[in-house]
Amino acid sequence: MAAWGKKHAGKDPVRDECEERNRFTETREEDVTDEHGEREPFAETDEHTGANTKKPEDTAEDLTAKRKRMKMDKTCSKTKNKSKHALRKKQLKRQKRDYIHSLKLLNVLEEYITDEQKEEEEEEGEEEELIRIFQEQQKKWQQYRSVRRERLKEMKLLRDQFVKALEDFEDLCDRVFSDEDSELDN
């Protein structure tokens, strides 16, 4: 092993074995060329024959991986559908609740409006009743005043007649007394 202060030169063989090989990024130039850089003939490599070069174990692993992916996709799809269904159900429930609350609010508002209209009509009726009562009282007062005026006129006439009668009686009494005085003087 390398000392603590020194850097490790070269590749780590353990790490090299653990790395997975990606078939899309591999160049495989080392398989095609020999150590001097010359190309080897195509007949010696399976890569250029056009045949499937995978081993049966690799194919089985690929199939099991594909099955696992399909199974995961299926479970994800089921979960997604369940969540969509639950979300839709929750939305419908919320819409139904909102609709019911809206209906209740509408009913309450209608009741409030009808109550307000009734109260307004009652107030108008009370006002009309008060106006009618006031007008009746005013008529009665006017009748009372006209009757009083007539009575005052009659009383004034009676007073004038009484005063005239008193004056006539006084004149009569004065004449009678003056006649008696004159007879007594004679």
UniProtKB/Swiss-Prot annotation:
GO terms for biological process: meiotic cell cycle; spermatid development. Pfam families: Cor1. Residues 66-93 have a biased composition (Basic residues). Expressed in testis and ovary (at protein level). Residues 10-27, 34-58 have a biased composition (Basic and acidic residues). One of its GO terms (cellular component) is nucleoplasm. Keywords: Chromosome, Cytoplasm, Meiosis, Nucleus. Belongs to the XLR/SYCP3 family. May play a role in meiosis. PANTHER family: PROTEIN FAM9B, XLR/SCP3/FAM9. This is Protein FAM9B. It comes from Homo sapiens. The lineage of its organism: Eukaryota, Metazoa, Chordata, Craniata, Vertebrata.
